[in-house]
Amino acid sequence: MLLLLAEYLQQFHKGFAVFQYLTLRGILGVLTALCLSLFLGPWMIRTLQNLQIGQSVRNDGPQSHLSKSGTPTMGGALILSSIGISTLLWADLHNRYVWVVLLVTLLFGAIGWVDDYRKVIEKNSKGLPSRWKYFWQSVFGVGAAIFLYTTAPSAVETTLIIPMLKDASIPLGIGFVVLTYFVIVGSSNAVNLTDGLDGLAIMPTVMVGGALGIFCYLSGNVKFAEYLLIPYVPGAGELIVFCGALIGAGLGFLWFNTYPAQVFMGDVGALALGAALGTIAVIVRQEIVLFIMGGVFVMETLSVVIQVASFKLTGRRVFRMAPIHHHFELKGWPEPRVIVRFWIITVILVLVGLATLKLR
């Protein structure tokens, strides 16, 4: 929006041409979303408290969590609104990738909002029934996949890239739709499973989102893409504005979500942010790198799968409680220790993911 204004004002002063630079608009995206979330955060927390939109806590979980009961939830709306406003202000609104990622994020956020609403407002402990949750996730995930597949200008945009191997790729054809569906929906649910401790999900999301922003910038520049032997995806660089907004909104939310949390993001935030990460990774053809950098999300998801499978097959539990962050809590780890150690793991994995740019 402001980019269009800057383009118009260039005829009066050439200095407005500076807004054409992706790096500047990416930084402005960070700062705008950060300021919005910090400014609106206290108001949103008070509003949620006045509406008595508080988190309910399971009695069979760690006893330390009982004190969290009643903490305002659905704070993910703060993240999404900050991301949305910042992206609309600074991104090129003629770019199809911007709209794909933004719409997927908001649509998955809508699923989470309905789930949270039923849990908190209607006092329905099950929230949105799983079959309906996965149905709408599938509808939106497949819809995004089909759009990206049918509008892909070149075969490279539907090819699976194998990192760390020179010229290693697998043409997917229509299989691209299937892979994209699993990446988007899987990422959405993985972040949601991780969102169980104060700040546990948001900081890894910020770090992975920032790294994906780097991939977007490099993939959208033909010279960098050729030098680094990564797919050149025209227009992908514009997503650095969205990634910047995600970073700013995430850090602003962390200001209020850090231990002990004043607000939780709820499904409205977790489902949306996970879907955003998955969609961006698909666009820049870095699904495997996302799997590496989002190792904490993968670990949390696998712990649930293993726990459920083991209990159904043998009647025994592998972990004291799943997702695995609760297992460590029940082993006696203080909540801040679990959180920070998972952050450290994410830092390491993000660095490994970025290293794949040069490891061939």
UniProtKB/Swiss-Prot annotation:
Its cofactor is Mg(2+). One of its GO terms (cellular component) is plasma membrane. It comes from the Bacteria. Its EC number is 2.7.8.13. It is found in: Cell inner membrane. Pfam families: Glycos_transf_4, MraY_sig1. It catalyses: UDP-N-acetyl-alpha-D-muramoyl-L-alanyl-gamma-D-glutamyl-meso-2,6-diaminopimeloyl-D-alanyl-D-alanine + di-trans,octa-cis-undecaprenyl phosphate = di-trans,octa-cis-undecaprenyl diphospho-N-acetyl-alpha-D-muramoyl-L-alanyl-D-glutamyl-meso-2,6-diaminopimeloyl-D-alanyl-D-alanine + UMP. It is a multi-pass membrane protein. Coiled coil: none annotated. Keywords: Cell cycle, Cell division, Cell inner membrane, Cell membrane, Cell shape, Cell wall biogenesis/degradation, Magnesium, Membrane, Metal-binding, Peptidoglycan synthesis, Transferase, Transmembrane, Transmembrane helix. InterPro entries: Glycosyl_transferase_4, PNAcMuramoyl-5peptid_Trfase, PNAcMuramoyl-5peptid_Trfase_CS. Its main location: membrane. GO terms for biological process: cell division; cell wall organization; peptidoglycan biosynthetic process; regulation of cell shape. Pathway: Cell wall biogenesis; peptidoglycan biosynthesis. One of its GO terms (molecular function) is UDP-N-acetylmuramoyl-L-alanyl-D-glutamyl-meso-2,6-diaminopimelyl-D-alanyl-D-alanine:undecaprenyl-phosphate transferase activity. The chain crosses the membrane at residues 25-45, 73-93, 97-117, 142-162, 168-188, 199-219, 236-256, 263-283, 288-308, 338-358. Belongs to the glycosyltransferase 4 family. MraY subfamily. Catalyzes the initial step of the lipid cycle reactions in the biosynthesis of the cell wall peptidoglycan: transfers peptidoglycan precursor phospho-MurNAc-pentapeptide from UDP-MurNAc-pentapeptide onto the lipid carrier undecaprenyl phosphate, yielding undecaprenyl-pyrophosphoryl-MurNAc-pentapeptide, known as lipid I. This is Phospho-N-acetylmuramoyl-pentapeptide-transferase. It comes from Pseudomonas fluorescens (strain SBW25). The gene is mraY.
